[in-house]
Amino acid sequence: MLDPDDRHLLIEALKPPPEMTLDIAVGTTFTLDLQALLVAPVSFALFSATAPGGESDSLALLEAVRRHADRITIFCQAGCIAVPRTLQPVLAWLEDSVVPVAPPRPGRLFHPKVWVLRFRNDAGEYAHRVLVASRNLTFDSSWDTIVCLDEDPAATESDDNEPLRLFLDELSAGAVQRPTDDRQQQISDLVESLRDVKWELPDGALEVRFWPLGGDHRLPDLTGDRSLVISPFLSGDTLQWLSSGGDRHLLVSRADALNSVGSLPLDGFEETFVLDTDAVEDSDDEPEAEQERVGIPLRGLHAKLFLVERGRRCHLYTGSANATGAGFGGNTELLVELVGGFPRGLFVLILQLTVDVDHLRPGQHLLRGIQHQRIVPLRLILVASLGL
Protein backbone atom coordinates (compact mmCIF):
# COMPACT_ATOMS: atom_id res chain seq x y z
CA MET A 1 0.00 0.00 0.00
CA LEU A 2 1.48 3.35 -1.05
CA ASP A 3 1.52 6.20 1.47
CA PRO A 4 0.19 9.43 -0.13
CA ASP A 5 3.60 11.07 0.37
CA ASP A 6 5.72 8.04 -0.58
CA ARG A 7 7.73 8.22 -3.83
CA HIS A 8 10.57 6.10 -2.48
CA LEU A 9 8.78 2.79 -3.13
CA LEU A 10 8.33 3.52 -6.84
CA ILE A 11 11.97 4.56 -7.23
CA GLU A 12 13.10 1.38 -5.47
CA ALA A 13 10.79 -0.69 -7.68
CA LEU A 14 12.54 0.71 -10.76
CA LYS A 15 16.02 -0.15 -9.48
CA PRO A 16 17.76 -2.70 -11.73
CA PRO A 17 18.91 -6.04 -10.28
CA PRO A 18 22.61 -6.22 -9.33
CA GLU A 19 25.02 -5.93 -12.27
CA MET A 20 22.20 -5.07 -14.67
CA THR A 21 21.04 -1.91 -16.44
CA LEU A 22 17.77 -0.90 -18.04
CA ASP A 23 17.24 -2.26 -21.53
CA ILE A 24 13.56 -1.45 -22.23
CA ALA A 25 10.74 0.09 -20.17
CA VAL A 26 7.12 0.44 -21.28
CA GLY A 27 4.65 2.19 -18.98
CA THR A 28 1.01 3.23 -19.05
CA THR A 29 -0.90 5.88 -17.11
CA PHE A 30 -4.16 7.79 -17.42
CA THR A 31 -2.88 11.25 -16.47
CA LEU A 32 0.78 12.15 -16.89
CA ASP A 33 2.88 14.86 -15.28
CA LEU A 34 6.01 15.41 -17.38
CA GLN A 35 8.04 16.35 -14.32
CA ALA A 36 6.93 13.13 -12.62
CA LEU A 37 7.94 11.23 -15.76
CA LEU A 38 11.48 12.55 -15.26
CA VAL A 39 11.66 10.40 -12.12
CA ALA A 40 12.11 7.29 -14.26
CA PRO A 41 15.10 8.27 -16.47
CA VAL A 42 16.72 10.21 -13.63
CA SER A 43 16.39 7.18 -11.33
CA PHE A 44 17.88 4.84 -13.92
CA ALA A 45 20.61 7.35 -14.64
CA LEU A 46 21.50 7.65 -10.96
CA PHE A 47 21.63 3.88 -10.62
CA SER A 48 24.04 3.60 -13.56
CA ALA A 49 26.11 6.79 -13.19
CA THR A 50 26.82 6.68 -9.46
CA ALA A 51 30.41 5.81 -8.66
CA PRO A 52 31.31 3.12 -6.11
CA GLY A 53 32.05 5.83 -3.55
CA GLY A 54 28.51 7.17 -3.85
CA GLU A 55 29.37 10.19 -6.01
CA SER A 56 28.17 10.87 -9.54
CA ASP A 57 29.69 12.91 -12.34
CA SER A 58 27.28 15.65 -13.51
CA LEU A 59 28.01 15.27 -17.22
CA ALA A 60 27.83 11.49 -17.01
CA LEU A 61 24.53 11.81 -15.18
CA LEU A 62 23.00 14.06 -17.86
CA GLU A 63 24.16 11.73 -20.60
CA ALA A 64 22.69 8.78 -18.69
CA VAL A 65 19.34 10.60 -18.39
CA ARG A 66 19.26 11.18 -22.16
CA ARG A 67 20.27 7.60 -22.90
CA HIS A 68 17.65 6.10 -20.59
CA ALA A 69 14.93 8.39 -21.93
CA ASP A 70 15.49 6.70 -25.31
CA ARG A 71 14.62 3.35 -23.71
CA ILE A 72 11.42 4.44 -21.94
CA THR A 73 8.03 4.68 -23.66
CA ILE A 74 4.95 5.89 -21.77
CA PHE A 75 1.39 5.59 -23.08
CA CYS A 76 -1.20 7.96 -21.59
CA GLN A 77 -4.66 9.23 -22.44
CA ALA A 78 -4.59 11.96 -25.07
CA GLY A 79 -5.21 15.40 -23.58
CA CYS A 80 -4.22 14.30 -20.07
CA ILE A 81 -0.63 15.53 -19.97
CA ALA A 82 0.35 18.15 -17.39
CA VAL A 83 3.06 20.42 -18.81
CA PRO A 84 5.06 22.54 -16.32
CA ARG A 85 4.65 26.30 -16.62
CA THR A 86 8.38 26.71 -17.10
CA LEU A 87 9.69 24.26 -19.67
CA GLN A 88 12.99 22.69 -18.69
CA PRO A 89 15.44 21.82 -21.50
CA VAL A 90 15.77 18.28 -20.16
CA LEU A 91 12.07 17.70 -20.92
CA ALA A 92 12.92 17.80 -24.62
CA TRP A 93 14.55 14.41 -24.16
CA LEU A 94 11.13 13.00 -23.24
CA GLU A 95 9.35 14.21 -26.36
CA ASP A 96 9.41 10.86 -28.15
CA SER A 97 8.91 8.93 -24.91
CA VAL A 98 5.28 10.01 -24.52
CA VAL A 99 2.63 8.37 -26.72
CA PRO A 100 -0.91 9.79 -26.33
CA VAL A 101 -3.69 7.22 -26.74
CA ALA A 102 -7.25 7.99 -27.84
CA PRO A 103 -10.05 6.88 -25.49
CA PRO A 104 -11.30 3.41 -26.50
CA ARG A 105 -14.75 4.89 -27.14
CA PRO A 106 -16.80 7.97 -26.11
CA GLY A 107 -17.32 8.08 -22.36
CA ARG A 108 -14.54 5.61 -21.65
CA LEU A 109 -10.90 6.05 -20.65
CA PHE A 110 -7.41 4.76 -21.31
CA HIS A 111 -6.80 4.09 -17.62
CA PRO A 112 -4.12 1.39 -16.90
CA LYS A 113 -1.15 1.97 -14.58
CA VAL A 114 1.55 -0.54 -15.51
CA TRP A 115 5.33 -0.72 -15.91
CA VAL A 116 6.95 -3.61 -17.78
CA LEU A 117 10.74 -3.52 -17.65
CA ARG A 118 13.56 -5.54 -19.13
CA PHE A 119 17.09 -5.36 -17.74
CA ARG A 120 20.31 -6.65 -19.30
CA ASN A 121 23.78 -7.54 -18.06
CA ASP A 122 27.13 -7.45 -19.85
CA ALA A 123 26.68 -11.06 -20.95
CA GLY A 124 23.47 -10.18 -22.79
CA GLU A 125 21.22 -11.99 -20.30
CA TYR A 126 17.78 -10.53 -19.56
CA ALA A 127 15.71 -10.09 -16.40
CA HIS A 128 12.12 -8.85 -16.46
CA ARG A 129 9.95 -6.99 -13.96
CA VAL A 130 6.31 -5.93 -13.97
CA LEU A 131 4.68 -3.29 -11.76
CA VAL A 132 0.89 -3.10 -11.59
CA ALA A 133 -0.39 -0.09 -9.66
CA SER A 134 -3.39 2.11 -9.04
CA ARG A 135 -1.38 5.38 -9.04
CA ASN A 136 -0.91 7.59 -12.10
CA LEU A 137 2.49 8.93 -13.10
CA THR A 138 1.81 12.23 -11.34
CA PHE A 139 2.50 13.87 -7.99
CA ASP A 140 -0.81 12.71 -6.49
CA SER A 141 -1.17 12.52 -2.70
CA SER A 142 -3.44 9.50 -2.59
CA TRP A 143 -3.64 6.05 -1.01
CA ASP A 144 -2.72 3.50 -3.68
CA THR A 145 -1.57 -0.07 -4.23
CA ILE A 146 1.35 -1.50 -6.19
CA VAL A 147 2.39 -5.07 -6.99
CA CYS A 148 6.00 -5.68 -8.08
CA LEU A 149 6.96 -9.02 -9.63
CA ASP A 150 10.47 -10.01 -10.72
CA GLU A 151 11.42 -12.79 -13.07
CA ASP A 152 12.47 -16.03 -11.38
CA PRO A 153 15.93 -16.77 -12.83
CA ALA A 154 15.85 -20.39 -11.66
CA ALA A 155 12.49 -21.26 -13.20
CA THR A 156 12.29 -24.09 -15.72
CA GLU A 157 8.81 -23.22 -16.96
CA SER A 158 6.91 -20.02 -17.76
CA ASP A 159 3.71 -18.41 -16.52
CA ASP A 160 0.78 -17.64 -18.78
CA ASN A 161 1.94 -14.20 -19.87
CA GLU A 162 -0.15 -14.14 -23.02
CA PRO A 163 -2.68 -11.61 -21.59
CA LEU A 164 0.14 -9.26 -20.59
CA ARG A 165 1.88 -9.69 -23.94
CA LEU A 166 -1.38 -9.01 -25.78
CA PHE A 167 -1.97 -5.90 -23.64
CA LEU A 168 1.44 -4.50 -24.62
CA ASP A 169 1.03 -5.50 -28.25
CA GLU A 170 -2.28 -3.61 -28.49
CA LEU A 171 -1.04 -0.33 -27.01
CA SER A 172 0.18 1.22 -30.25
CA ALA A 173 -3.09 0.45 -32.05
CA GLY A 174 -4.91 3.17 -30.11
CA ALA A 175 -2.12 5.73 -30.30
CA VAL A 176 -2.96 9.16 -31.70
CA GLN A 177 0.50 9.09 -33.24
CA ARG A 178 2.35 5.79 -33.40
CA PRO A 179 5.66 5.43 -31.56
CA THR A 180 8.84 5.89 -33.54
CA ASP A 181 10.14 2.84 -35.38
CA ASP A 182 12.87 2.33 -32.78
CA ARG A 183 10.38 2.40 -29.92
CA GLN A 184 7.94 0.14 -31.72
CA GLN A 185 10.78 -2.35 -32.20
CA GLN A 186 11.57 -2.14 -28.48
CA ILE A 187 7.95 -2.93 -27.62
CA SER A 188 7.90 -5.88 -30.03
CA ASP A 189 11.16 -7.21 -28.57
CA LEU A 190 9.75 -6.92 -25.05
CA VAL A 191 6.53 -8.70 -26.00
CA GLU A 192 8.53 -11.56 -27.49
CA SER A 193 10.93 -11.95 -24.55
CA LEU A 194 8.03 -12.09 -22.05
CA ARG A 195 6.89 -15.34 -23.65
CA ASP A 196 9.11 -17.56 -21.49
CA VAL A 197 9.13 -15.57 -18.23
CA LYS A 198 8.26 -17.15 -14.88
CA TRP A 199 7.55 -14.68 -12.06
CA GLU A 200 8.77 -14.89 -8.48
CA LEU A 201 5.61 -14.89 -6.35
CA PRO A 202 5.12 -13.43 -2.87
CA ASP A 203 5.08 -15.93 -0.01
CA GLY A 204 1.62 -17.48 0.17
CA ALA A 205 0.82 -16.94 -3.51
CA LEU A 206 0.42 -19.99 -5.75
CA GLU A 207 -0.34 -18.36 -9.11
CA VAL A 208 -0.32 -15.00 -10.87
CA ARG A 209 -2.64 -13.94 -13.67
CA PHE A 210 -2.94 -10.75 -15.69
CA TRP A 211 -6.31 -9.33 -16.72
CA PRO A 212 -6.44 -6.68 -19.47
CA LEU A 213 -9.89 -5.08 -19.53
CA GLY A 214 -11.71 -3.35 -22.37
CA GLY A 215 -12.26 -4.30 -25.98
CA ASP A 216 -12.83 -8.02 -26.47
CA HIS A 217 -11.03 -9.10 -23.29
CA ARG A 218 -13.05 -11.32 -20.95
CA LEU A 219 -13.73 -10.24 -17.39
CA PRO A 220 -12.28 -11.96 -14.33
CA ASP A 221 -14.72 -13.61 -11.94
CA LEU A 222 -14.80 -11.25 -8.94
CA THR A 223 -17.71 -12.99 -7.21
CA GLY A 224 -17.23 -15.47 -4.39
CA ASP A 225 -18.34 -16.86 -1.07
CA ARG A 226 -16.90 -13.85 0.76
CA SER A 227 -15.17 -10.73 -0.46
CA LEU A 228 -13.69 -7.33 0.31
CA VAL A 229 -13.96 -4.50 -2.23
CA ILE A 230 -11.82 -1.34 -1.96
CA SER A 231 -12.58 1.30 -4.58
CA PRO A 232 -12.80 5.12 -4.52
CA PHE A 233 -15.46 5.19 -7.26
CA LEU A 234 -18.59 3.05 -7.46
CA SER A 235 -21.58 2.28 -9.63
CA GLY A 236 -24.69 0.43 -8.52
CA ASP A 237 -24.77 -2.29 -11.17
CA THR A 238 -21.13 -3.22 -10.55
CA LEU A 239 -21.67 -3.40 -6.78
CA GLN A 240 -24.64 -5.71 -7.28
CA TRP A 241 -22.50 -7.96 -9.48
CA LEU A 242 -19.65 -8.02 -6.95
CA SER A 243 -21.96 -8.92 -4.05
CA SER A 244 -24.03 -11.52 -5.90
CA GLY A 245 -23.90 -14.91 -4.21
CA GLY A 246 -21.94 -15.76 -1.09
CA ASP A 247 -22.75 -14.78 2.45
CA ARG A 248 -20.37 -11.98 3.50
CA HIS A 249 -19.11 -8.96 1.59
CA LEU A 250 -17.39 -5.79 2.85
CA LEU A 251 -16.91 -2.50 1.00
CA VAL A 252 -14.40 0.33 1.53
CA SER A 253 -14.86 3.55 -0.44
CA ARG A 254 -15.32 7.32 -0.15
CA ALA A 255 -18.35 8.77 1.61
CA ASP A 256 -19.41 10.68 -1.50
CA ALA A 257 -19.20 7.56 -3.65
CA LEU A 258 -21.30 5.54 -1.19
CA ASN A 259 -23.91 8.29 -1.02
CA SER A 260 -24.09 8.57 -4.80
CA VAL A 261 -25.09 4.93 -5.41
CA GLY A 262 -27.94 4.89 -2.87
CA SER A 263 -28.90 2.11 -0.49
CA LEU A 264 -30.10 -0.64 -2.85
CA PRO A 265 -26.69 -1.54 -4.38
CA LEU A 266 -25.24 -1.63 -0.86
CA ASP A 267 -27.75 -4.17 0.44
CA GLY A 268 -25.47 -7.03 -0.61
CA PHE A 269 -22.66 -5.79 1.65
CA GLU A 270 -22.63 -6.68 5.32
CA GLU A 271 -20.70 -3.52 6.19
CA THR A 272 -19.42 -0.44 4.41
CA PHE A 273 -16.47 1.70 5.45
CA VAL A 274 -14.89 5.01 4.48
CA LEU A 275 -11.45 6.45 5.11
CA ASP A 276 -11.48 8.18 8.47
CA THR A 277 -11.76 11.89 7.66
CA ASP A 278 -9.91 12.66 10.92
CA ALA A 279 -6.92 10.73 9.58
CA VAL A 280 -6.63 11.83 5.95
CA GLU A 281 -7.95 14.50 3.66
CA ASP A 282 -10.46 12.76 1.38
CA SER A 283 -10.95 13.28 -2.34
CA ASP A 284 -13.16 15.96 -3.75
CA ASP A 285 -16.77 15.23 -4.61
CA GLU A 286 -16.42 14.60 -8.33
CA PRO A 287 -17.44 11.70 -10.56
CA GLU A 288 -14.84 9.24 -11.81
CA ALA A 289 -14.34 10.57 -15.33
CA GLU A 290 -13.76 14.08 -13.95
CA GLN A 291 -11.84 13.23 -10.79
CA GLU A 292 -8.47 12.41 -12.33
CA ARG A 293 -8.00 15.75 -14.06
CA VAL A 294 -4.76 17.09 -15.46
CA GLY A 295 -2.78 19.21 -13.02
CA ILE A 296 -5.11 18.58 -10.06
CA PRO A 297 -3.47 16.17 -7.57
CA LEU A 298 -5.66 13.39 -6.22
CA ARG A 299 -6.07 12.98 -2.46
CA GLY A 300 -7.56 10.36 -0.18
CA LEU A 301 -8.44 6.84 -1.26
CA HIS A 302 -7.36 5.86 -4.78
CA ALA A 303 -6.53 2.16 -4.31
CA LYS A 304 -8.55 -0.47 -6.16
CA LEU A 305 -8.50 -3.93 -4.59
CA PHE A 306 -10.77 -6.96 -4.75
CA LEU A 307 -10.21 -9.82 -2.28
CA VAL A 308 -12.37 -12.85 -3.06
CA GLU A 309 -12.69 -16.25 -1.40
CA ARG A 310 -13.91 -19.15 -3.54
CA GLY A 311 -13.74 -22.63 -2.09
CA ARG A 312 -10.25 -23.23 -0.68
CA ARG A 313 -8.61 -20.48 -2.69
CA CYS A 314 -8.32 -16.75 -2.16
CA HIS A 315 -7.97 -14.38 -5.10
CA LEU A 316 -6.48 -10.91 -4.69
CA TYR A 317 -6.96 -8.52 -7.63
CA THR A 318 -5.48 -5.03 -7.79
CA GLY A 319 -4.62 -2.51 -10.47
CA SER A 320 -6.37 0.36 -12.20
CA ALA A 321 -10.04 -0.68 -12.44
CA ASN A 322 -12.60 0.94 -10.15
CA ALA A 323 -15.77 -0.86 -9.08
CA THR A 324 -17.73 0.93 -11.81
CA GLY A 325 -19.45 0.17 -15.07
CA ALA A 326 -16.68 2.03 -16.89
CA GLY A 327 -13.95 0.12 -15.06
CA PHE A 328 -15.37 -3.24 -16.12
CA GLY A 329 -17.29 -2.15 -19.18
CA GLY A 330 -15.20 -0.30 -21.72
CA ASN A 331 -12.20 1.41 -20.13
CA THR A 332 -8.76 0.13 -21.03
CA GLU A 333 -7.51 -1.23 -17.70
CA LEU A 334 -5.23 -3.90 -16.27
CA LEU A 335 -5.51 -5.97 -13.08
CA VAL A 336 -3.11 -8.48 -11.62
CA GLU A 337 -4.48 -11.50 -9.74
CA LEU A 338 -2.59 -13.35 -7.01
CA VAL A 339 -4.07 -16.70 -6.04
CA GLY A 340 -3.35 -18.01 -2.54
CA GLY A 341 -4.28 -21.03 -0.47
CA PHE A 342 -6.76 -20.61 2.37
CA PRO A 343 -6.27 -19.68 5.11
CA ARG A 344 -2.47 -19.50 5.44
CA GLY A 345 -1.77 -18.22 1.96
CA LEU A 346 -4.38 -15.50 2.29
CA PHE A 347 -3.11 -14.37 5.65
CA VAL A 348 0.45 -14.05 4.34
CA LEU A 349 -0.82 -12.01 1.38
CA ILE A 350 -2.69 -9.73 3.80
CA LEU A 351 0.43 -9.23 5.92
CA GLN A 352 2.44 -8.28 2.84
CA LEU A 353 -0.29 -5.98 1.57
CA THR A 354 -0.59 -4.02 4.82
CA VAL A 355 2.93 -4.07 6.20
CA ASP A 356 3.69 -0.55 4.93
CA VAL A 357 0.39 0.76 6.28
CA ASP A 358 1.22 -0.40 9.79
CA HIS A 359 4.31 1.82 9.87
CA LEU A 360 2.43 5.05 9.18
CA ARG A 361 1.79 7.70 11.79
CA PRO A 362 -0.89 6.71 14.34
CA GLY A 363 -4.40 7.03 13.00
CA GLN A 364 -3.55 7.41 9.33
CA HIS A 365 -4.47 3.84 8.42
CA LEU A 366 -7.86 3.83 10.13
CA LEU A 367 -11.27 3.31 8.58
CA ARG A 368 -14.58 4.42 10.01
CA GLY A 369 -17.67 2.24 9.71
CA ILE A 370 -20.57 4.36 8.45
CA GLN A 371 -23.33 2.28 10.03
CA HIS A 372 -21.83 1.81 13.50
CA GLN A 373 -19.30 4.66 13.59
CA ARG A 374 -16.57 2.19 14.49
CA ILE A 375 -12.92 2.89 13.84
CA VAL A 376 -11.18 -0.26 12.64
CA PRO A 377 -7.57 -0.82 11.46
CA LEU A 378 -7.22 -1.77 7.81
CA ARG A 379 -5.58 -5.09 8.72
CA LEU A 380 -8.65 -6.06 10.77
CA ILE A 381 -10.94 -5.21 7.87
CA LEU A 382 -8.97 -7.53 5.60
CA VAL A 383 -8.89 -10.36 8.13
CA ALA A 384 -12.54 -9.97 9.09
CA SER A 385 -13.62 -10.11 5.46
CA LEU A 386 -12.71 -13.80 5.40
CA GLY A 387 -13.40 -14.60 9.02
CA LEU A 388 -9.80 -15.24 10.08
Feature annotation, model-predicted:
Residues 1-226, 231-369, 374, 378-380, ...:
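PLD/PLD-like phosphodiesterase catalytic module centered on the HKD motif
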